[in-house]
Design a protein with these regions (language model features):
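Aromatic- and acidic-residue-enriched carbohydrate-binding clefts of CAZyme catalytic domains
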Residues: 52-59, 131, 135
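Conserved small/polar residues in nucleotide/adenosyl-binding loops
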Residues: 1-5, 207-212
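Flexible, glycine-rich phosphate/dinucleotide-binding loops
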Residues: 40, 55, 116
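An aromatic- and glycine-enriched ligand-binding surface/loop that stacks and positions planar moieties
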Residues: 44, 48, 81, 96-103, ...
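Conserved, well-structured interaction surfaces
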Residues: 3-41, 59-96
Length: 212
């Protein structure tokens, strides 16, 4: 899900009867998208033309990059925390997002942001900004948050768990096994899940989108 579409679902979904669980999925994927972007490019725009995290329906060439701390504290953390609260324990569709998946992504986001604040390798950031947290927390605080939320996920795994052997993780008969946390399930037999479907598919069959 692209950020603009997620903005639209989050902003307008409740007006047309979209369930809290589906809204939580939109929050999860928007938070995940911003998390991937901030790791790759540094600070990225939160305002796509209609205001920060607002649904934009017109072309805009005036977006300005937010800082790395702003992306994390305004987008990544709030969206993933909403997902943790509102998502169900079991996936809505095969391979779909759950409370456990959101907890683990949030844990990784806390860990990554803590490392960014600490900056042990003296890596430059863009746009340039002070490596301080808007809420006044230090790297150690975020590392503790990462530990705490990961422990919650491990103690409450939901439908996930370890297979009996490493062989089973990769063997064909055990496809869609319980070690895979998040993936897009595409099959030729199902019109909705067939990646090559001209109606519903993307013409590309992505499978096993495992948690980074």
């Amino acid at each position: 899900m692209y950020k603009r579409q997620a903005n639209g679902v989050i902003e307008n979904g409740s007006k047309v009867g979209v369930s809290d669980a589906l809204l939580a999925e939109a929050h999860f994927f928007r938070g995940m998208d911003y998390f991937l972007l901030v790791q790759t490019f540094g600070g990225v725009p939160l305002d796509l033309g209609a205001g920060e995290l607002k649904f934009n329906i017109s072309t805009s060439r005036t977006s300005v990059r937010n800082t790395v701390p702003e992306v994390y504290t305004k987008a990544v953390f709030p969206d993933l925390k909403t997902a943790v609260t509102e998502l169900p324990d079991k996936p809505r569709v095969t391979g779909g997002v759950t409370k456990t998946v959101a907890r683990l992504y949030l844990s990784k986001a806390y860990l990554t942001y803590g490392w960014w604040l600490e900056n042990p390798n003296n890596i430059p950031t863009y746009p340039e900004c002070n490596r301080t947290d808007p809420d006044g927390h230090d790297a150690a605080w975020y590392y503790q948050q990462a530990y705490d939320i990961a422990t919650e996920a491990i103690d409450n795994p939901g439908p996930y768990g370890l297979m009996e052997s490493f062989y089973q993780v990769n063997a064909g008969p055990y496809d869609r096994n319980k070690e895979i946390l998040l993936y897009a399930d595409h099959t030729q037999e199902d019109e909705y899940y067939n990646g090559g479907s001209l109606t519903y598919g993307s013409a590309v069959s992505y499978t096993h989108l495992t948690l980074p």
